[in-house]
Amino acid sequence: MTCQTYNLFVLSVIMIYYGHTASSLNLVQLQDDIDKLKADFNSSHSDVADGGPIFIEKLKNWTGSNEKKIILSQIVSMYLEMFENTDQSKPHIKHISEELCTLRDSLSDGVKKVKDLMDLAKLQMTDLRIQRKAANELFIVLQKLVDPPSLKRKRNQPQRRCNC
């Protein structure tokens, strides 16, 4: 119950956050549907506050717009997974699920980035073959870390002309 209630709260935040960019979202209807969903899950139960929020704390660590899309894409996917195990015959659940699917589709780039991060986490850096590949790519990775704006500033500076 605790997870589900905080999930519902974060769902509200996601819907509102993307409601400003996705004009097709009817936030008033979604809020009403989410209230019905909270009632379905009995989110006023006393154990809801135990352990703190599930997603809200994670959202605080992702500050940039692109970063938020990455974490929100994962959270939206988790909500959709949660709704797979609920009664889809209820209109409010069906409506929320449909809106989440629309949001997930608009965040598909974030889903790919999450997959990339998970793939990186799975790499066995003790494997000699992986180490060889990593050594081969190290210079390119370091080039990506170099501050590109410093190079741009040099190009944009007016060239000094010789007054000979």
Curated annotation (Swiss-Prot):
Subunit structure, interactors included: Homodimer.
Annotated GO biological process: adaptive immune response; defense response to virus; humoral immune response
Compartment annotation: Secreted
Main location: secreted
Name of this protein: Interferon gamma
Gene3D superfamilies: 1.20.1250.10
List of glycosylated residues: 42, 61
Any one of the GO CC terms: extracellular space
PANTHER family: INTERFERON GAMMA
Signal peptide positions on this chain: 1-19
The keyword Ligase belongs to this UniProt entry's keyword annotation: no
Matches recorded under SUPFAM superfamilies: 4-helical cytokines (SSF47266)
Pfam annotation, one family: IFN-gamma
Family: Belongs to the type II (or gamma) interferon family.
Protein function: Produced by lymphocytes activated by specific antigens or mitogens. IFN-gamma, in addition to having antiviral activity, has important immunoregulatory functions. It is a potent activator of macrophages, it has antiproliferative effects on transformed cells and it can potentiate the antiviral and antitumor effects of the type I interferons.
Organism: Numida meleagris (Helmeted guineafowl)
Keyword terms of this UniProt record: Antiviral defense, Cytokine, Glycoprotein, Growth regulation, Secreted, Signal
GO molecular function: cytokine activity; type II interferon receptor binding
Keyword Methyltransferase found: no
Origin: domain of life: Eukaryota
